[in-house]
A protein has these predicted regions:
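Extended, domain-scale alpha-helical bundle/helix-rich regions
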Residues: 14-127, 131-135, 142-144, 167, ...
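Charged, cofactor-coupling segments
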Residues: 4, 22, 122-124, 128-165, ...
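Long, charged, glycine-rich C-terminal linkers/tails
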Residues: 281-290, 389-393
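Extended boundary segments
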Residues: 247-279, 353-385
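Conserved hydrophobic/aromatic pocket- or pore-lining residues that grip, position, or stack substrates
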Residues: 136, 231, 268, 287, ...
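Single conserved hydrophobic/aromatic residue that forms the stacking wall/gate
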Residues: 1-8, 12-13
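Beta-rich nucleic-acid/ligand-interaction surfaces
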Residues: 115-119, 394-399
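Conserved AWS/pre-SET-to-SET junction and N-terminal core of the SET lysine methyltransferase domain
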Residues: 78, 286-298
């Protein structure tokens, strides 16, 4: 008998559930192409208590024979070196050097964001994420890209060939791996390689499989100077779009127009898509009014959404991917009268945001250590947020990536060139949700007899609402940071705005006192 169960999003809950419902000596069926090796191992640990086993099967192919949509096959293209900083050949050289250090001669790259970075490969197979469904097998003298070759243009195929990359069909990857006759030590990351691929590698006697974390993750986590320069520029254009969005929002509300949470995404798309080099939203816009914002990843729908009123807060978390960078920004806008608690929550959230943004630390500090800096202003009031403070952002890719982050579990040491979001918040269920988010760039601040000091600088330039701030709460240093930030916002955005827009921005960026 094969016991089946729904796989939930929480790994530990899912694994315990499967272990609970499986009968003694039972079998759990799953598709090895859609389950990572790490997932299967985690499940097996829970099944061991009942002497249960896992059986790989693909019931979808057997049962869904009619009307099944094909896999996504959007046009695949290469991000130009002028945006990426390095060619695929140069990145392959970097990877091979790292593999040699790890005692490996080959790697199967199965994680789409790592593969995209390695080969500068982009497509639109995943909503809001410019990646192609593919695998890449890298050896000392060759790289083979498994992809639906029909969607790779002749120009892109020629460029890949020039960079030492051969094309093969996506569906041939398992056959290819099983047929490898040359002895290789293959790096396979259990977290990112699916179980069917991992088993195929293990079953080939010519291949020795070595479990290692994917070295591409830290390589792409530190942005090169070209990537940094372009993403800074992308954020300025994104800031222009955000300014125009807020102006329209304020004008339409002032005119008494009835707006809903759904209206927000429409306005944002209008202004972002008008910007040069726009590709797509980087994720589905979160526009949450009033109590809805207390649900951290709330999404309005046609069936369930709120109307905006002239009171309370509107939280807008949004972003875009351009040819030269990916953005992620949250602003919480006051729409009218606020309660004293709402104003205090907003001010304390802003303190958290500022304190991590202006932090200075020694170069051994990791995301876990820095996370406490952001939370301390809220902890003083016995408040906490049940999520991370920030996450890494890809360059022209997915809005969440690793290896670094600001949260209570991350142990990756921060390095110059890393980008991370700064997004503390207060979430009072059924009452209000507040979040303020910028992207920050880590840079080297100073060297002295005590060591190497690092710091952050913002790369998001959009005014932060100052009217909700409770007087006397922000310190002089925090006020100085906020005023300096707004001066920089105005300096960067004003030259790209109309005269009326500049006047509006000048008011939003006006210095405030204690």
């Amino acid at each position: 008998e094969i016991a089946s169960c729904l796989v939930g999003s929480e790994m530990c809950i899912r694994d315990r559930y499967c272990g609970k419902v499986l009968p003694e000596g039972g079998k759990l069926g799953l598709c090895g192409l859609t389950a990572s090796c790490g997932l299967v191992r985690s499940l097996q640990k829970e099944l061991d208590a009942k002497k249960g086993t896992i059986k790989l099967l693909n019931l979808e192919d057997e049962l869904w024979t009619e009307g099944r949509p094909a896999l996504p096959a959007t046009p695949a293209w290469l991000l130009p070196k002028e945006y990426a900083g390095f060619s695929p050949a140069e990145k392959l050289g970097q990877l091979r050097a790292k593999l040699s250090e790890l005692g490996c001669t080959a790697q199967l790259v199965g994680k789409l964001d790592n593969l995209a970075w390695l080969l500068n490969l982009r497509a639109m197979d995943i909503q809001c994420t410019p990646y192609a469904m593919a695998y890449c097998y890298v050896t000392p003298d060759k790289a083979t890209l498994f992809i639906d070759t029909a969607r790779v243009s002749a120009e892109a195929a020629a460029e890949l060939k020039e960079n030492g990359v051969e094309l093969a069909e996506y569906g041939d990857v398992l056959t290819f791996l099983a047929a490898q006759a040359e002895e290789q030590t293959v790096l396979a990351d259990p977290v990112s390689v699916n179980y069917a691929v991992y088993q195929t590698l293990q079953a080939n006697p010519a291949l020795t499989v070595k479990d290692e974390a994917d070295p591409l993750l830290p390589m792409k986590g530190v942005k090169n100077e070209v990537e940094l320069a372009h993403t800074r520029e992308a954020h300025i254009r994104d800031g222009v779009a955000m300014v125009r969005f807020q102006i329209e929002l304020e004008n339409r509300l002032a005119a008494g127009e009835e707006l809903t949470e759904l209206t927000i995404d429409e306005i944002l798309h209008k202004y972002r898509s008008a910007q040069d080099k726009f590709l797509t939203e980087s994720f589905g816009t979160i526009a949450a009014y009033g109590p809805n914002a207390a649900m951290m990843h709330y999404h309005a729908t046609e069936e369930d959404h709120a109307k905006l009123e002239k009171k309370g807060f509107l939280l807008v978390d949004s972003g875009a991917t351009y040819m030269d960078g990916t953005t992620d920004i949250t602003r919480t806008y006051p729409l009218g009268e606020l309660t004293e608690d709402e104003r205090l929550f907003y001010t304390w959230t802003l303190q958290c945001h500022i304190d991590i943004a202006r932090a200075v630390w020694l170069d051994y500090c990791d995301g876990h250590m820095l996370d406490t800096i952001a939370r301390e202003p809220l902890w003083r009031h016995l408040i906490n947020y049940r999520c991370g403070t920030g996450h890494s952002v890809s360059h022209v890719g997915n809005v969440h990536e690793g290896p670094h982050a600001l949260n209570g579990r991350n142990t990756t040491v921060f390095k110059p060139g890393m980008i991370v979001t700064d997004e503390p918040g207060v979430y009072e269920g059924g009452v209000v949700g507040i979040r303020i988010e910028n992207e920050l760039e880590c840079y080297h601040k100073a060297s002295n007899q005590y060591g190497e000091f690092l710091a952050f600088c913002p790369i998001t330039f959009v005014p932060i609402a100052t009217s909700p701030i409770v007087p006397g709460v922000l310190s002089r240093d925090e006020l100085d940071w906020l005023n300096a930030y707004h001066r920089e916002v105005f300096e960067k955005l004003a030259p790209r705005l109309t005269e009326d827009e500049r006047d509006w921005l000048a008011k939003k960026c006006a210095a405030i006192g204690a």
